[in-house]
């Protein structure tokens, strides 16, 4: 779940912040490297460069709670709580020094922050304090006492004495944080209108994907959702969310622009009256654009009490929300539910490479792939406490199996809610990952356990 950040104007150092311990688990000169296996997405990232320090283990402080992070141009500010004190923590660096500006947003008698180091040659000092009676570093912790509202301090962490270039870094940390647009490029990528085949009344339009883009990002698309104004949000496996505009009657003025980035393999977007939600391997985010410039500047943690694994053939798939405001998603072989109080529970298990997600306000569907203990791909109507085959015990029946001639690797499932679909309104469309086709899903709920079928 670590969040890696490039620090300094010229990428002087990198740091990895751990939301599960509210600490920096590594600082190094360099960046990260991904293994080539499965496009680099089935193994964890590795440090590439020379570490200053790494922490193999770190614990969450008592009453600690990670809240998310903010973007101010190149500046990243992590936000969390320890007890009743809300804290903002901004890392920065020069070539020889790692800095943290820590803002204590409310009054407190005493606060203890993690600041563990593994190299005795690295020294900790405080070069700027405001609204704090006493501050010290001891036994891997920063201890501040007599804290006034909106107090702050700047920590200097280095093996060396102060260099002349540090004055610029300190001035940067003391300066006002301003919301700034980071990606000004708007890519015009016209779409293509489809034509009905034969006597069909249905056509398939095409939105062209900007594979050649200024950020050199790989456009492996994973999920999409529509905003109330008709614009779309599209996620990519490497970690971007794109805003797609101009989806109208002729598709001549379709544009793509970067909306958010930095996710760990996002494969789930949900939009409703509560906001824009994104699921990645270790967290559900609630995204905020605070200044209306069509870029996300506040990445709020909605829930992160699940997941965190460094290797897998499969991923984390979602994100379906039922009428009770609960989110449903799949991670590895298990099915999870995050309730409106933002707590997550495993509710079912035994699914194999289960990337298919769908359902309605009243139920949740999951679609595993054929293979071990899964005789053929299937659609499951998930019931709490059930097992669905991969463990080889107590196998519960699916809504339906999908014959191999129809689909060999299921994708998502979509409820048809528009009357423009004519007689298919209220039905479900299944999408094939394996063959790029689609089919109709039928559901009969007249018996004790719903049953279904697929129609190519």
What are the residue ranges of the model-derived segments?
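Generic recognition of long tandem-repeat/solenoid scaffolds
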Residues: 76-80, 100, 134-146, 276-278, ...
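Short, exposed beta-strand/loop patches in secreted or surface proteins that constitute
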Residues: 64-71, 132-137, 269
């Amino acid at each position: 779940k670590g969040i890696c950040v490039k620090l300094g104007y010229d990428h002087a150092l990198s740091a990895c912040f751990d939301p599960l311990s509210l600490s920096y688990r590594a600082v190094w000169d360099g960046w990260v490297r991904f293994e080539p296996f499965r496009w680099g997405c089935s193994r964890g990232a590795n440090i590439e460069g020379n570490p200053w320090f790494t922490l193999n283990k770190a614990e969450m402080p008592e009453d600690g709670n990670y809240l998310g992070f903010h973007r101010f141009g190149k500046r990243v500010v992590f936000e969390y709580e320890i007890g009743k004190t809300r804290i903002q923590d901004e890392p920065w660096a020069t070539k020889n020094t790692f800095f943290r500006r820590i803002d204590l947003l409310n009054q407190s008698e005493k606060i203890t922050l993690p600041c563990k180091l593994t190299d005795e040659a690295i020294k900790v000092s405080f070069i700027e304090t405001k609204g704090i009676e006493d501050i010290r570093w001891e036994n891997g912790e920063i201890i501040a006492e007599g804290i006034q509202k909106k107090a702050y301090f700047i920590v200097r962490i280095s093996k060396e004495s102060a260099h002349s270039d540090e004055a610029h870094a300190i001035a940067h940390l003391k300066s006002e944080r301003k919301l700034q647009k980071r990606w000004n490029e708007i890519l015009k990528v016209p779409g293509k209108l489809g034509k009905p085949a034969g006597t069909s009344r249905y056509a398939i339009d095409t939105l062209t994907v900007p594979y050649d883009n200024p950020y050199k990002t790989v456009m492996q698309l994973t999920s999409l959702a529509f905003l109330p104004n008709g614009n779309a949000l599209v996620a990519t496996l490497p970690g971007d969310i794109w805003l797609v505009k101009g989806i109208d009657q002729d598709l001549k003025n379709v544009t793509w622009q970067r909306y958010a980035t930095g996710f760990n393999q996002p494969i789930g977007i949900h939009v409703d009256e509560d906001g824009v939600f994104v699921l990645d391997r270790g967290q559900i985010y609630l995204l905020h654009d605070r200044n209306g410039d069509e870029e996300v500047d506040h990445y709020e943690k909605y829930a992160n009490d699940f997941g965190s694994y460094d290797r897998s053939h499969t991923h984390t798939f979602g994100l379906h929300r039922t009428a009770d405001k609960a989110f449903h998603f799949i991670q590895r072989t298990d099915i999870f539910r995050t309730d409106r109080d933002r707590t997550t529970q495993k509710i079912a298990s035994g699914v194999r490479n289960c990337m298919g997600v769908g359902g309605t306000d009243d139920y949740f569907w999951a679609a595993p792939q054929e293979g071990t203990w899964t005789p053929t791909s299937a659609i499951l109507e998930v019931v709490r406490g059930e097992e669905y085959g991969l463990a080889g015990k107590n196998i519960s029946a699916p809504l339906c199996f999908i014959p191999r001639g129809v689909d060999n690797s299921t994708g998502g499932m979509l409820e048809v809610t528009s009357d423009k679909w004519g007689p298919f309104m209220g039905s479900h469309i299944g999408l094939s990952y394996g063959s790029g086709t689609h089919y109709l899903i039928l559901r009969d709920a007249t018996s004790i356990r719903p049953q279904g079928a697929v129609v190519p």
